[in-house]
Regions:
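Basic helix-turn-helix/winged-helix DNA-binding cores
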Residues: 1-62
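Short, charged amphipathic alpha-helical surface segments
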Residues: 53, 58, 66-100
Length: 100
């Protein structure tokens, strides 16, 4: 098990981010010591965190990631995000064309 500080370093996120993910139900600690309040995470959760970070980098919102993790309409959510990215790409390409 990892304490939150070590887990945040391995996951390359801030402790504040982990607290937020806990608050919104995205990634809860595996164990919280009742005496100290220390939060502990497992190595399996590190994989989950990497997945969450990757989805955030692609531009998914926390609510979308919650839906993906829950398994609801995953294909539809991914398809919609792909369409959004393609549209953004086209807009940027058009702007670059105008600059030339």
């Amino acid at each position: 098990m990892y304490k939150i500080g070590m887990f945040s370093k391995h996951g390359k996120v801030t402790i504040k981010t982990l607290h937020h993910y806990d608050e919104v139900g995205l990634l809860r600690p595996a164990y919280i010591d009742q005496e100290t309040g220390y939060r502990y995470y497992t190595s399996e959760q590190l994989s989950q965190l990497h997945e969450i970070v990757a989805l955030r980098q692609i531009g998914f919102s926390i609510s979308e990631i919650l839906k993906i993790i829950a398994g609801s309409n995953v294909d539809e959510i991914l398809k919609q995000r792909k369409t959004e990215l393609e549209s953004e790409y086209q807009n940027i390409t058009n702007k670059l064309f105008r600059l030339n």
